[in-house]
A protein has these predicted regions:
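NTP/phosphate- and nucleic-acid-binding module
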Residues: 44-584
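N-terminal chloroplast transit peptides
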Residues: 1-41
Length: 584
């Protein structure tokens, strides 16, 4: 079942967590305190997690205006009913995700395993996200550049930890041309065209960029140097899933060099905040900011900062990382600078990036069993307008009058910077159009027929549900549409934030967490588990083997809570508060 609510979310909300704990709150903004502290964990169905880790408010059923021959609910309320061909989240969450991607027309399979085709709608989502993020990256002082796709294999071996981290994922180029076989039987690598040094198809660009930094940085006057690039990378994956894990993916990677350690670390933390703000403001997705454990940090980094998001099934999704690289790459590539005292010093470094994985996070955070649900801030089309007409061939005068009315509405919305699409497929039944746009997640659907035009209104349906409502085409029409979009954006964030709080648990013993996760294996729910932890790589590996849960991070705002507490696994004095979860 999809969560439904009236906008905006008001007093009297109830949030039920995956462990069966129900909170009644006066307002969603109150749900910003400490996570629930659970002593006895209950086994409950996974379906409860998907349904109840959301905010709901009592509402009357929508009034429907029937459309003869329509499908997908006719002119009924938005976001209602089940999606044909979409597996429910309760039945199979993984298949549901695949089905929603297909129904939303986001990707298609290519003949190359692990390399998906991102279709126009999927690319439009990435473009919206990229444009917003690029503005914030530029404001941080970074400049865009582009570096080669191919990296000499010797570069990768300059930083020992880095090569260990990526060696098994690298695609290698060994020849620079092909030759035709006899009798037209195809082509093969030309044995006379073997490269003197093999090239790596970039899995990430630290080595190439630091080689270039060694040429560009000479003096303290050259610092800080902040470079960003938008590119594709290749990491050979055996198990792939659209957007979440693919062999080739699109991303943004930033690389900076600084005169001091403090300045570099401050930059890494600043970019983590940028990523978290984009997730909140654009994707309507709350995240937990933290440090990775030593076993999970980026290869070649001193510290890795991460943002972790909670998906509807209680699993975590790493949504962005920012790395404090220390002087490791500066040493490997000899990047020195002359300071103000004419002394030579090594620079300090960071790197940071997010990828098209954020599109997958968006889909998993908000979508339902009908299809996509898109936050207005990132939706390629924020409004779809469906004129109810038989087309210009029948009753041309009435059609022309209707389309003039539609154009006035379009102009009013465009003046308010609303992204709008008018569906003029008049040979298609309106109900089929409604169903299609629901599956594609457009935040607001507007319908206008003769009755609406006579009343000077457009009939609106929110993708997130609730009663349909008329909106008068007057001087404030554009502003009212913007207000509705803002309310939808906020409601989606409030729902996701409520889920995060309701599905985050503090436990004091390993048995509690293990029992809860074992319950999820037989149909129960998962979640985030905050635990006191003593750093121990072997214990971390053992827990992963037994439960499939890993340390997602050490939350930055919880590390002061270790005093006087013992590790939930070993009983030794706690060194951190760790967040464990199963993860995509």
């Amino acid at each position: 079942q999809k969560p439904s609510f009236s906008l905006p979310i008001m007093r009297g909300l109830q949030v039920t967590g995956v462990l069966g704990v129900t909170l009644s709150v006066a307002h969603s903004s109150m749900m910003t305190g400490m996570p629930l502290r659970i002593r006895q964990l209950q086994r409950i169905p996974r379906s409860h997690c998907i349904r109840s880790c959301a905010v709901s408010a009592t509402q009357s059923p929508p009034k429907k205006r029937k459309q003869k021959g329509s499908q997908g609910g006719g002119r009924g309320g938005g976001g209602s009913g089940g999606g044909k061909g979409i597996t429910s989240r309760e039945a199979d969450y993984s298949q549901w995700y695949q089905d929603v991607i297909a129904a939303g027309d986001l990707t298609d399979q290519s003949p190359v395993k692990g390399c998906a085709v991102i279709k126009p709608t999927g690319m439009a989502l990435w473009d919206s996200l990229r444009n917003e993020l690029d503005q914030r990256i530029r404001k941080s002082g970074a400049q865009n550049a582009y570096f080669p796709l191919f990296i000499p294999v010797s570069f990768l071996s300059k930083e020992a930890e880095h090569v260990d981290g990526f060696a098994k994922e690298c695609a290698v180029v060994t020849h620079h041309r092909l030759r035709a076989l006899e009798e037209g039987k195809g082509v093969e690598p030309d044995p006379h065209a073997r490269l003197e040094e093999p090239l790596i198809v970039r899995p990430t660009s630290e080595t190439m960029i630091w080689y270039m930094f060694s040429k560009w940085i000479m003096s303290y006057r050259d610092l800080p140097l902040k470079i960003n690039q938008w590119a594709n990378v290749v990491r050979w994956e055996l198990r792939t899933r659209p957007f979440l894990r693919t062999t080739e993916f699109l991303w943004q990677e930033g690389h900076t060099a600084h005169a001091t350690s403090d300045e570099a670390r401050q930059c890494a933390e600043q970019m983590l905040d940028v990523y978290a703000s984009v997730c909140k403001d654009v994707l309507a997705m709350p995240v937990v900011k933290g440090l990775k454990s030593p076993t999970e940090r980026f290869a070649g980094a001193d510290d890795t900062y991460t943002i972790e998001a909670l998906m509807q099934n209680g699993w975590a999704l790493q949504s962005g990382t920012s790395h404090f690289l220390g002087q490791n790459f500066a040493k490997a590539f000899g990047v020195n600078f002359q300071n103000a005292n004419n002394e030579q010093e090594l620079v300090w470094a960071t790197s940071w990036g997010v990828s098209t994985r954020l599109v997958g996070a968006l889909v998993m955070s908000h979508s339902d069993d009908v299809g996509l649900v898109l936050p207005p801030a990132v939706a390629p089309n924020q409004v779809v307008l469906v004129p109810i007409s038989q087309g210009p061939g029948k009753a041309p005068e009435q059609h022309e009058e209707l389309m003039t009315f539609v154009q006035k509405a379009v102009v009013a919305m465009e003046r308010s910077n609303v992204r709008i699409h008018v569906d003029t497929r008049f040979s298609m039944r309106p109900g089929n159009k409604y169903f299609e746009w629901e599956r594609k997640g457009v935040p607001i659907r507007m319908e206008v027929g003769a009755r609406d035009m006579a009343a000077g209104t457009l009939l609106c349906a929110r993708r997130t549900g609730g009663e349909k409502f008329p909106l008068a085409l007057d001087d404030s029409f554009g502003a009212k549409v913007v207000a509705e979009l803002e309310a939808i954006q906020q409601a989606l964030y409030d729902t996701a934030e409520a889920r995060l709080h309701a599905c985050t648990f503090e436990v004091e013993s390993y048995a509690e967490m293990k029992d809860a996760l074992e319950g999820s294996d037989s149909g129960g729910a998962s979640g985030f588990f905050l635990v006191p932890w003593f750093d121990d790589a072997e214990a971390e590996a053992q827990i992963k083997t037994e439960t499939k849960a890993t340390i997602r991070c050490f939350p930055l705002d919880k590390q002061h809570l270790t005093e006087g507490r013992t590790c939930f696994y070993s009983g030794r004095p706690a060194t951190h508060i760790a967040l464990f979860a199963r993860a995509f």
